[in-house]
Swiss-Prot record:
The keyword Transcription regulation does not apply. It comes from Nostoc punctiforme (strain ATCC 29133 / PCC 73102). Residues 1319-1349 have a biased composition (Acidic residues). Zn(2+) binds at C219, C293, C300, C303. InterPro entries: DNA-dir_RpoC2_beta_pp, DNA-dir_RpoC_beta_prime, RNA_pol_Rpb1_3, RNA_pol_Rpb1_3_sf, RNA_pol_Rpb1_4, RNA_pol_Rpb1_5, Rpb1_funnel_sf. DNA-dependent RNA polymerase catalyzes the transcription of DNA into RNA using the four ribonucleoside triphosphates as substrates. It comes from the Bacteria. This is DNA-directed RNA polymerase subunit beta'. GO terms for cellular component: DNA-directed RNA polymerase complex. Its EC number is 2.7.7.6. Binds 1 Zn(2+) ion per subunit. One of its GO terms (molecular function) is DNA-directed RNA polymerase activity. The gene is rpoC2. In cyanobacteria the RNAP catalytic core is composed of 2 alpha, 1 beta, 1 beta', 1 gamma and 1 omega subunit. When a sigma factor is associated with the core the holoenzyme is formed, which can initiate transcription.
Amino acid sequence: MTNEKMIFRNRVVDKGQLRNLISWAFTNYGTARTAVMADKLKDLGFRYATKAGVSISVDDLMIPPTKRLLLEAAEEEIRATETRYQRGEITEVERFQKVIDTWNGTSEALKDEVVVHFKKTNPLNSVYMMAFSGARGNISQVRQLVGMRGLMADPQGEIIDLPIKTNFREGLTVTEYIISSYGARKGLVDTALRTADSGYLTRRLVDVSQDVIIREFDCGTTRGLTIGPMTEGAKTLIPLATRLMGRVIGEDVVHPVTKELIAARNSPIPEDLAKKIEKSGVGEVVVRSPLTCEAARSVCQHCYGWSLAHAKMVDLGEAVGIIAAQSIGEPGTQLTMRTFHTGGVFTGEVAQQVRSKIDGTVKLPRKLKTRTYRTRHGEDALYVEANGIMLLEPTKVGDVTPENQEVHLTQGSTLYVFDGNKVKQGQLLAEVALGGRTTRTNTEKAVKDVASDLAGEVQFAEVVPEQKTDRQGNTTTTAARGGLIWILSGEVYNLPPGAELVVKNGDAIAANGVLAETKLASLHGGVVRLPEATPGKSTREIEIITASVVLDQATVTVQSSQGRNNYLVSTGNNQVFNLRATPGTKVQNGQVVAELIDDRYRTTTGGFLKFAGVEVQKKGKAKLGYEVVQGGTLLWIPEESHEVNKDISLLLVEDGQFVEAGTEVVKDIFCQNSGVVEVTQKNDILREVVVKPGELLMVDDPESVIGRDNTFIQPGEEFQGNVATELRYIQYVETPEGPALLSRPVVEFAVPDNPDVPSTTSVSQQTGRSIQLRAVQRLPYKDSERVKSVEGVELLRTQLVLEIEQEGEQDHNASPLAADIELVEDTENPEVQRLQLVILESLVIRRDITADATQGSTQTTLEVYDGLTIAPGSVVARTQILCKEGGEVRGVRKGTENVRRCLVLRDVDRLTINTSTQPKVKVGDLLVEGTEVAPGVFAPESGQVVDIKNAAAASGGESALSTKNYVITTRIGRPYRVSPGAVLQIEDGDLVQRGDNLVLLVFERAKTGDIIQGLPRIEELLEARKPKEACILCRRGGEVKVVYAESGDEAIAIKVVESNGVVTDYPLGPGQNLIVPDGSIVLAGQPLTDGPSNPHEILEIFFSLGSEDGIYACASLALQKVQTFLVNEVQMVYQSQGIDISDKHIEVIVRQMTNKVRIDDGGDTTMLPGELVELRQVEQVNEAMAITGGARAQYTPVLLGITKASLNTDSFISAASFQETTRVLTEAAIEGKSDWLRGLKENVIIGRLIPAGTGYNTYEEPGAIDDYAAEISSSVLDEVDDPLDMVLDDRTARTYNLDSPTLGESGFGSRRAERSVLDDEDELIADEVVDDDDFEEEEEDDEDDFDDE
């Protein structure tokens, strides 16, 4: 290179410049030489970095001296805000907002200061050099080092209104450090989650786009995409030149002024041409795009444009789908999910502020449309409803009348000055809303609790409560009009339940005076028992015996067996009862206390029970047994039953056989009685063997005796020639020897009508409660019940049951009484213990509470002593609630059924103001802090005036002499401002404790920019999910008319009037804010409210608009609108994070999401309704239908998310390898699908060569190779023939005709292909004639499955 060519450029080469340099070298000189240059640059950099020794020391961190002043100013402003809040001028929310915005502004101002300071004092400062050259770090990190860290968010994402005022150079305080670590932890968690999410996103993207391969040179489409620079508000995110680079022009570009041709159709756009087009001032250019490419199932070379890796036209067979997927997925890890990289530091978009340049007066023109509104800081301002200007009239200096200054205001701006206001230079006039997207800042409804700072009485001032009841019947009280809620100070006592006040409003009470008392009364009366304090039981229980019963003749003995005590009660008539309930336990009404021990009713075996004369209560529980009502005889027919459940082969006797006692009936089972065997078996399993004792009488004539089956024979009756001596039971049996009658013995048990009861004495109160023990006989079995048992059973039990009569107390709240079992010593003989049952009422006395913060202390006195008999309802103990400090009782509500709180107004709660002049206030006025109460005298604290006295008159002197001395007494209070719509949680006049919630303020806050950003937003877009709070889209274009609610400024609906007069209504839901002004013209598909748009809705709106060109044009238009929307939205997210991705990658993915339609009506085609088919395919079939005159298919375009699109590909192998494998494969099998192995994934799974790169078959058609060489030679061979470019890639090899070895006969067979007869101009229907031996090589080209239609 000669010296004449040397150009010296004197500029700083920072990160951006380096990038441009390398990109230029790469485009112009190829890979190898660029690599060498990059290497040299690296050496250069390292050499000088080493020489300079740039490093950061603590001294390099220079803190701007203005920091202190800035912080002081901010703190001053916040103090002022705090005062306004204390005075009730702004709500809690407005205070919070103001604090946050103040700190935010300060932080930003400080950041600018830092930069200025560095530039002024030391531009070679190493921190400054590093950050601003782009080597390491960025401005926000520098800000944290030398400015202030600023506001942080807590784990819930709420901003903490305590900023970190220090930086890392000064060091953080402990509090600041802890607040900092919130954000840091969040960042770590986020990174961990993000990598996983991002990886999965990449996987889905690859899956949806893996079969997009460049398969043609030119699809010949005339459609294209109109591209302009990408802007957000006034800021250009991506300039036009950048977006054009590497594209192919779709329509000739003509210079807007000279009308000369800049670039022709189908020419690629290198960097210089892109710059030239941008300079010429062309606003938008039509380019070819993968979105509009008409190649079937692929993208053609012209529509894709450059391969960005080589800055050359893309090759045939390039797998652009995979490249696109990776280009979008890879930066995913850099996208934030929630927090910013700065460790949770809050960054907010500050609106652009307009400050006055001069001193002067504000003049607002008449035609400027404004309405007053309250800003989020609680200040009054004007909202500009339509674009306009305001004038500043400068203050006259001398005779010169200077020019008026104009300030332009856009719709949505906020004016902080009013007509006629005087302003100083530098004063804030307005905040201009930034145009574009930021005006649709997403707001969300949020609520904030306001808790009371002091205890006292609630008083509403100007607040108008309004009650609403929802469908569930819950009532909410909201403030219809905003205003103040006052809490007037006083000590509030919470009274325990059941307490009765002993004072009334206005009473004076001394410290420790009684406010209220609770009485503890006995319900039933009786004898008082005060138990001694045992370790387990405290004396706070009082027992009152209401009734008792004693077994006076019976003695109780205790038998211990195996560690368990058995209590036996022996009565005078030699009966022994076993106690079923142990002493010290409670017994319920009707429970068994004891059971008689006797053996008279025991049987020896199981058997059959019949009643003779015995009657039992019908409704008995089988578990407890049946109570005997009337005595009689029980007849018991014994039989012996063995339950076996073994195999039938073990049976040693047969059914009906007579056996002697001791015979082995089943292996290891012997019978105990002689009798007839009855065997029950099922499925060769022996269930049971029953031996029925008795005598067997053989009969000859079965008919004559069949009537005697199951009857009794009385003693003395003659039967079958024998005279019976006792009662027998006759049964007919079939024995192996023949029919016979079995005469079975019967055992009789006599049951008396009433069992004898041990004697008792009972004591009962006059209340009519009585208690007694009753003896009951119970039978465990029913009449004719078979009892299976080998051992004996007990047929009758005699039990003692407790009975408590509750007279006149059928109401359920009288608890079911229980009796206590006790052992008492006999009065005459202390050795003997008697059994006593008592009914106790036990009352618990409250503990004495020493003064609790909210309750006052309590004191309890006992009114009874041990052994005293009391009447029902008498008071046993009373608890008094004492007042802590003296004062006046207030706030006792009349008429409310139970008083839960009362208030004592103490001296501490009052404040006296002395004034020598006549007061301006009257009793009952509510004053906020700083109000003038008399000329020159101001209220030191907020409160309510309770008294105004003339001191002289009060002292009893002549009032005429000194009227100059007034005393104003106020009751300290605290105002809280309530915004309209807030939910009230208290009522006027309520008493509240400190910390009780007063109201829920409902407010709208701008969502922090990063709530749904980054990955989640990209996922939402690519999965085509409906956004949570979507905006309302205009369905048809027209003029906007805003409908306001009656109350005034809140818009409740939008009407759009079309040109032909049709009106469409759009009601506004809660939290939806208008972004179109009244009277403006909107287009179809334009958002009317803020929030993200729903892509499905965009598609539907444009499809339903219709067009003259038929359904295909209509669907194409709708799809194109949605495609551009998606591409731009995805770009927005990446741009907001400073990541550059070429549009074409996103377009490839979006193309895959939007190439299907849902068939509504198949017409005469073979397609079914609901089927998802490619748009181009349907259109092809429809064209065929049009020729034959059949009915066309009707369809609706659909937008599929990437997961759904992957599962709906033509290739079932690819879909199955992605998700839901079994479902995909079974459905494919049922439908008999075939897979044409078009994509990469299918081929990898089957194990074939993939149809991309070297595996792509360029030589399908003779002559293709020649076109191909011509195609690329023009664009590639400009500077490649340079010996330095050592990298030899396939492209250059092909151009130099270094033929890559093709496979011979041994490979896939020779590939002979001819164009088919059906060859069509637009190449949509192309068919291959394939050799028979070419079966493995499936039709790879754009072969279509519908040729035979």
